[in-house]
């Protein structure tokens, strides 16, 4: 299952001076309706223009169809205008915030007297459909002066603020202003040409509201004006819009499946983890069943790291603030850290300070502490590459509005390692690390990757430009040699060095950032790290930061959604459950389970008072990969019957064969769910 595909770029069309772009597109034979109808054009400078645009000179433009990313974005922006018109018709007191297109949809913010209800959304959808059916025309109008704009929008305080801040706004979600002109888009009655409604907007827009063939309002929520909690409280309505009903249905099906797979929902249903209010936002606890999965993940990771030559270390959760002054985190990452704890201060009886205290911080990253381990004694080139690894707990102050389940938390455990090597070893270490990353992800059934190269943020970095350029070029070379698609991420690097991140697609086609590999020449300098080279000179090591899971919590959440809670048998908290047809046959299954447990399998017998069919239903809902049933014939034959997650069943399997099948399947770390097919001759091993 994936999102609808986008059409390929169209051939260029010549637009004569004095002719509308829409006329030229029609005369070139492009479709006038359907999902590939042209909704805007792109000029030679890459700017999107309305079809009503009339160039002063002959130009060539690229038609942009509705079923492209840009086409959908324009449709969604226009749908946001239709939503705003509907809201102001139903709630005349509503004041307009902003209404941009976003990934797969749009939203609009409003100042209203109360939150929107589901009934409000249903009523607004009906009004929007009426507006769309009326085929209102979007008409761009340049406002001659700031004074004229202020006068026209005098009753819209948020729009007035945008007008006043016009020159200082750099936010892609603010569509109201931009460029050298102030423009308003009027919605015109197609019969009379009279203005029905209008909004401050830089555009572009579709020709008419009838170019919105499919839309749906999805939800509402609270919001802050311009995302700042110190600003006015607003109400936000989200929606989605597409080039066809079929594309929208496909998207809504994807959303419904994503909701069914939501790891927060499954975490509760499968008793894996929870988020107690008593602990605070972004601080999960893992229950016994979730703890089993987490332990399996960590144990397998340790095994693989030993095979790759890593050495295990452990560091504390808090440190004196000076450490993060040296590393630069307090200068460049303070907003992502929890506030300082001022401790160890001693006072005299009169309240004066006898012994000054010190600021301690929860660690946001492990790298400074690993540097102290490297620096704890002299190092020789013979020790390099030195690969230090730990499951390090770190704490980051994420704003409450962005905390989300396990995928965005405030306390997390990283499978974190730092590699110290010579410059001569650097490229091979990077290449080896990248292959290690990809191999480990494949071991968990994630094998659809691309790479992202995050480069220097010119406003937030330490070190020399030349050093950054060398590090970036080296990472790019290693990434390109992997054969994977490489996507640039300008300005996305941490302050101390560029990074490669592995982007993974899950079963629904969604992209998740997983592993990161960062090259760092700067922290070794700041910590004065040295090793003795083979010629006796002191040299700086190169430092490579890498986390393969990213964090245990995030990886756990992604895996939960990827497998919809039906974890591979080797990860499943309960791998086998015995279900007797009647209580009389339970002892037979207890004997089988005893053998499985002795072989290291997590097995149990469902000894509840429920009837057999209810037990099958319950354990299927708990997504147990192997259910072993036993009735009179099974007991008599020394056999069991297999039942699988998909409902398939194989009867009368001898117990010795059943134990072998289960243990071999788990031992091979198969990621697919077992089915009846695996018991066919030649399939089970």
From Swiss-Prot:
Obligatory cofactor(s): Zn(2+)
EC nos: 6.1.1.3
Entry GO CC: cytoplasm
GO BP, sorted A to Z: threonyl-tRNA aminoacylation
Domain TGS: 1-65
Note on cofactor: Binds 1 zinc ion per subunit.
Keywords linked to the UniProt accession: Aminoacyl-tRNA synthetase, ATP-binding, Cytoplasm, Ligase, Metal-binding, Nucleotide-binding, Protein biosynthesis, RNA-binding, tRNA-binding, Zinc
Catalytic activity: tRNA(Thr) + L-threonine + ATP = L-threonyl-tRNA(Thr) + AMP + diphosphate + H(+)
Class of enzymatic activity (EC top level): ligase
Binding-site residues, Zn(2+): 367, 418, 545
Xref: CDD domains: ThrRS_anticodon (cd00860), ThrRS_core (cd00771)
Domain of life the protein comes from: Bacteria
UniProt protein name: Threonine--tRNA ligase
Native source species: Rhodococcus jostii (strain RHA1)
